[in-house]
Amino acid sequence: FFNCADEKGNYYTPKSADSFEFKVDQFADLAILRYQIPGWEELTLKEKELVYYLTQAGLAGRDIIWDQKYRYNLEIRSALENIYRNFSGDRNSDEWNAFEVYIKRVWFSNGIHHHYSNDKMKPGFSKEYFDSLLASSNTALEGNPYNVIFNDVDSKMVDKRKGVDNVLESAVNFYGPNITMDDVTKFYSSKTQPDPTKPLSYGLNSKL
């Protein structure tokens, strides 16, 4: 966030709009864009420091969102990122390229479910290749967090279809596994509001 000099003592000069590269990356159905911040250099050091800490607060809250969206998201992300940092094999193969696309989609969606459709995203690489990445990068991922990448379990983060149990069929982590709509209805119907003008939020700290 600060205007740092390079090894030669040359300070960064913001590029003009004509020379600025807005597109950072493009993969799957996504294009990643960045933007200039006009007036950034005119901010005081205190104002820049405030922006820094606001950004850090956002990063701290990010993991809450990941966990709320799906119970295995954080464990899966940790494994994928460890592979991405430590894999020393061929990074030009088709399967590695497929792995890169997958981890970028997971980053963008804050989890393994698509940010619009809520469908679980399928990897373009084989289970055997993923096993080789885990082994060669000394990464551990086992049990349900491993299996769910490749199987059809928890295929929808939020399932809004009619005629199904929307709570049971949704993988979102607001409720524990195997909780049904009937469980939710009974839970809330048993609660009372002592003062209707000051309603209590019973569900904030409960996964039933």
Locations of regions flagged by a protein language model:
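C-terminal motif of bacterial Sec signal peptides marking the signal peptidase cleavage site
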Residues: F2-A5
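N-terminal helix-rich structural modules
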Residues: Y11-L208
